[in-house]
Amino acid sequence: MFPDIEVNDKGHLLIGGADAVELADEYGTPLYVIDEMRIRENYRRLYRAFSGEYSRFQVFYACKANTNLAVMRILEEEGSGIDAVSPGEIYTALMAGFDPDRILYTGNNVRDDELQFALDSGVRINVDSRSQLLRLSEIAPEGLRISFRVNPLVGAGHHEHCITGGEMSKFGVMEREAPEVYRMAMDLGFEPVGIHAHIGSGILDPEPFMLAVETLMDIAGRVHEATGVEFEFIDFGGGLGIPYTPEEEPLDIDEFASKITGLFKDKLSEYGLGRPMMCLEPGRYIVGDASYLLTRVNTIKESYRKFAGVDAGFNTLLRPAMYGSYHHILVAERPLDEPSEKMDVAGNVCESGDLFARDRQLPEINEGDVLAIMNAGAYSFSMSSQYNSRPRPAEVLVREGKVDVVRERETFSDLLRGQNVPARLLKR
């Protein structure tokens, strides 16, 4: 999964057949560059692996990873569904052309108007709590088909903030209460048809995922035995990781799929659950390594340490500051150069934690160089902000050298959009 480095006859980095240096020159920096074919290849690799083992398989892309409309259109063309966690994501998915039945809404701490929006949109609703179920029952039509998110008491992820299962998690119905909650839903006039869990993000070790699958299947079995619910789908969530460092090994997706589907089929047989749809909700696995963030070096500073200062900050790419995440960095003009000195790569936000790399061995870097920050496709633009009153960057989509602007660069006027000064504060 760690992308191979391609160069052109100038020695410049190629992304989707386009010269990264020329992209930076033409479209400005910072700039997100999205490789269309990498997204398609990642989706197809995963879909082939699982559907080859179990034909009733469906992907619901976790669009919180990257909600760019063009990215979502690509995945709609590929046959994916959408895992949406907010009304805004539902709206975006609908605008991207997804059929409502291919959108699974899994919100938490949801307002009544958000539930109404989901109902009006016709999407599938995945209920997170008793409270949500009771409030939904007051506005939902008789016989509404729903599913439940269950906390299987298994959690895993690349950082504690990304663990979404276990006793400390805010998400889902407690596993021991699952049969009771399904019965409650039936008594309220709902038709429960699915069960769901999601344990965390950035998982490269299959063992926690295997445990989560086993646990959720056991819960599904207990619910079926206690209530007679016939599951139309069982959704194991997402969390499949990608290597962020050159040393990390990617998931062997074929082996992973074989293990997961084998366990799934064994449990179906054990509990007499028939042949429901098996669902996964990958986000990072599909888009994570399909984008680069291009940023230009404007300052080389040598004080008590050496800094390469760039024109992006944690307002553009938050993960290193928030999670301490490693993102590999190339010099776009010379991507094959070997590391030669230790330095920090610092952003332009007025915070001491605004660093893309600390004490990193990097090639020679000069003012004016374009740095390419790799694996910037997931939880990157979608977590960006206007902090320090800096407009968000543009995004371009590349395929076989063709370039399309798929998000315009924000301007200063965008920083003030929606703001109003009361008349009493205006100068007379």
From Swiss-Prot:
Q: Which domain of life is it from?
A: Archaea
Catalytic activity entry: meso-2,6-diaminopimelate + H(+) = L-lysine + CO2
Q: A Pfam family this protein belongs to?
A: Orn_Arg_deC_N
Binding site residues for substrate: 284, 319, 323, 351, 379
As recorded in UniProt, its EC number(s) are 4.1.1.20
Q: Signal sequence: where? A: none
Note whether Lyase occurs among the keywords: yes
Give the quaternary structure: Homodimer.
Q: Supply the name of the protein.
A: Diaminopimelate decarboxylase
